[in-house]
Structure formats: C-alpha cells, structure tokens
Amino acid sequence: VYRLFVQSLTSSSRLGLAMKSHVAWLKRAGIAGLLSIVVSGCSDNNSSFSISDRTRSLIPEAQTGVSEAPGVVKLLDEKFGDPQTLKAWSKLPVQWGGASAKVEVFAADGADAKVKFVAGEGQTFPEKATFVNVVTGAGAGRTLQLSSWDAATGEAVLTGLGGATLAAGDTCSIDGGAVIQSGRVLYMRHCSHCHGTAGDGNGPTAQYLYPRPRDYRHGVFKFTSTNDMSKVSREDLLRVLRYGIPGTYMPSFLLMKDEELTAIVEYVRFLSMRGEFERKLVNELASDYSEEAVESRLKDEQRADIVGELAKFLAEDVPGVVDGIGAELEESWVAADSDEAKIVPSVPRVPDSEESRRRGRELYLSKTLNCADCHGIDGAGNGPQTVAFEKNPITNVPYDEPGLHDVWDNLNQPRNLHTGIFRGGRRPIDLFCRIHAGIKGSRMPSFKNTPHEDIWHIVNYVLSIPFEPEPGATGVASAPAAPATEAAAPAAGE
C-alpha cells in the first residue's frame, strides 16, 4: 500500500496529460495493489459514502466483521475509501492520473534537492506536477513538494525535505491520482446534488425530479452504443455529459473542458464499480447472514454458532470472493471500451422513404417485435403493458401500481413517440442502438437478432411519427406491404 497526499486540489488545474493509468505498472512492480489518495484542503466538500439498504439488511457482524475478519463495510473502505480518502484498487480499470517513475539522480542541497526521474514503462509525465509520493526506499510513504518540474526531462526540485532522502532506483509517483481527485471535486460541485455522494441517485434534489436521477451502484446505464451484454463505454458517458438527456433534468455540460469531463467520467465509473462490488459481496452473504435468514435459522441453531460460522467464512472464503469480484469488474468494464462491444450496423441506413416507413410500421405491429404492447398502436406510449401489474423480480411480489418498472424500481412510462423527444439521442444511429441493444435496466428489450435492414426500417418509421398528419397515417391498412429492400448506400448527410 502506498499513499498519495493531494494538497489543495482544485477542479482541474492538475489534469494536464495525466491520463496514463499505472495499474499495469503496479502489477509488474509487485507493489501491493492498493493506492490510497488522501485529499486535504477540500473541507467545503467533506462527505461520506453511504451503504446500501441491502448491506443494512445483513446482521451487524456481517456488516462490520468479526474479530480480524472484515465485513462488507470495512472491505468497502479498504478497497475504495471515502470521498476524502479515495483508495485506488489496482484491479479497477480506472484512469487514476499521474505517472510512476524511478529516481535516477538525487542531489540534496540543504532542505531542497535536485532530482531526475525516469518514467516507468508505458508512463507519460504530467505537464504540471506539484508533489511526489515516495513508494519504495528509505522515504517510502512520504509526500514531497515540488518547487519546479520539467515534464520533458523529468528534472525537478524537491522542497521541504525534512530529513527525507531518496536514492537511485527508488520508486515514486508523480502527481498520482490527479484525475480521479479532480473528478471527485467536479462531481461534488456539479453532480452530487442530484446523483448523491455515493452515486445512489438520492441527492437532496432527487426527490423533486422525474425521472429520478441515475443510481450508478448497479453498474447499469440506460443509453449506450454497446451491445446488450456490455456495460457503458467511456464515450457513451462523455456523450451524456456533453449533450445531456433530452426530456429529463440531466443538463448539458458542453462548455466544460474535455479534461474535466474525462475526470468526471472516471469518477462516475469508480462510483459504479464501488456499488457493484458492494452488491456482489452482499449477494454472497445475504442468503445465510441477513437479519431475515438468521432469524429463520435461530429456530434450530444458536446465534453464537452462526456468528462463528460467519467469522470462518469471512476469514477463509471472502478474500477469494473479493478477488473474484475484482477480476469480474475489471473484465466487464474493460470489455465495454473494446471494438467487440460496440454496435456496428452490418448495412448502411436504408434511405428514408414512404415504403421504408410502411415496412417499419409493419414490423412495429408484428407479433415478433410487438412494439405496440408497450408503446401503443399509434406510438403514444399507452400500450396494454402500461396498465398491467408487474412483479418485482427480486421479491416476486406485485408492485403497488400498474405499469413498467426498471431495475431501480422506478415506474417508467414507455416513450410517447409523437413528441420526437428521444432520451438516448435522436440521431438515426442512436435509435438503431436502442432497438438493437434495448434500454439497459428497463423493460425495453434487445432486438439484436432482427435483421439490421429491418431495424433501419423501424428507425425511419419512428422518426416519422412526430410528423404524421394523424396517428398511424403511415399504417399498412390501406397500402400494400413494402417489398424487401436491398442493402442501400447511406442517405445524403448520414
């Protein structure tokens, strides 16, 4: 474990080019896989991460731990820290910022010293840097201030050594954690009042908003350009930040700098991974060690025996569970940014035409796709599913109100297609992705097995609905079915 003490951090002044993650370097160097980033000078944003209701449903010993074996709350703190003391778990595919380096030359001069650093493999020095964290050697754990820094040569002047010395070969981190900490400050300033400090979608203004702000802790984001089995990509999150979500209270941050948006994206991903970690860990414990489960077990067992069994499980099995969850998070979030995850139509967009729209409406009404079941025959968002009572998939108990619910248990009205407002974007490719992958976390399913040409026909029809002289005017009742369309070149401007 090594610590990065980030002093007087402002919203973006230390980002520079510090976007090279040193996770891989940490693993090659054999350094413990946890990096603690301690922020001071941010008292205006002091806060703490909340734990989920599902964590609270566990018995106290499962939450806090037994003896030396940590429970859910302590493991969350060990791996993720709190907003003032973020911890960078090396398994997480997050761009923390900063660069790893080794000391090549160290020449002390009183309380100061001239140092030359050599960047680690695959690392790029940040253009601006104000501190160095000593990772190995006699000064390990110290944070030293830079009075001058040259990113081109790696030469620096350290000030206020206080007796600390470095030697050739010592490992240091230059401005480590600058990106994630900048993201944290920006998030607290611009996002937390709706999305909450922990990303739980329960900030102080959330109760007044419809739809509710996104709860990141599921690791699920609705509007993506990735396939139905993949998570949200960085580019998807950047697009939401830049352009907002039409028809909701999510605004556009188009005037923010690219490096600021990038920092927020990394912090949102960090919060999502923290929430997923908590959920997956609780899933391992809930069946035997929730308050409800223990109450049932007490009919035949003693509480002391149950707690003893829990202590053994936490000490012997949970470390492996934690590593497994970390590996799963790493794999799934890395995959989301891969070419394989991105939705790419196999044919160009079918030119928008009356025939294409008719074919699209045929498909919309077909038993195979059955779009009208939710969106209504005329696309007004009033299909029969809006008055049916669903069961909660977790509790298997019907919801109190009719209609469609998402994974956050929010009531979702299917989109009224006559408004022309599409929350995931109104570009043809945006609608293609909504149909291909569905809307993650909602009842809108994936139609990935539908021929891409047919998806384009549906896109053309849906985009025409707001301009129909009357609902269903492009319907097929008075018109012959449109013939199958050959793969066509993109329409002008597409």
Indicate residue ranges for each PLM-predicted region.
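Electrostatic cytochrome c docking/interface patches
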Residues: E61-K102, A107, A111, G120, ...
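Charged, amphipathic alpha-helical linkers/stalks
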Residues: N283-S296
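Periplasmic/extracellular electron-transfer cofactor-ligation site
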Residues: S43-S50, A178, R184-P211, G244-G247, ...
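C-terminal motif of bacterial Sec signal peptides marking the signal peptidase cleavage site
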Residues: V38-G41
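Bacterial N-terminal signal peptides that target proteins for export
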Residues: F5-L15, M19-G30
